[in-house]
Amino acid sequence: FQISWKAKVARTFQNIRLFGGMTVLENLLVAQHNPLMIASGFTFLGVLGIGGYKAREAEAIEKAKFWLEKINLIDRADDPAADLPYGDQRRLEIARAMCTDPVLLCLDEPAAGLNPRESADLNELLLSIRKDIGTALLLIEHDMSVVMEISDHVVVLDYGTKIADGTPAQIQADPR
């Protein structure tokens, strides 16, 4: 796997960064702000439909709804993001990152603080992103069960030094 320096990269943080005062849907739409502004021509006339804004806005809403369905939050679209349980907030943050259509999604400790059910839901989502959507994932994770379940290649670091590199099966067979 190689990635160009021009590739679109998205990132989620260990500490969830949502706009708590915005709705769940608005959190997904804000990720698509730049394409919407470009479609508007950066003018008020663009918002009125001149310059393709309305068509782009409809596409943004469809993409947001796709991700809301994928993370099972379509029925909470109008709820404030701050009112969601922690596991739902984590999945919403990942969906927001995916609304930017990244080639590579970097996740810092995505399973931190999740209970077993939430962790299983997260693993299912990340596996779907990797296999169905085709987005490469870069996981920074201490929970090796998460890494082994969703990864096709693992690099183990010890204070920045690579100590193991291979498939999950190879890493499990030789856990240095």
Regions found by a protein language model. Give the residues of each.
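Glycine-rich phosphate-binding loops of nucleotide-dependent enzymes
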Residues: 1-176
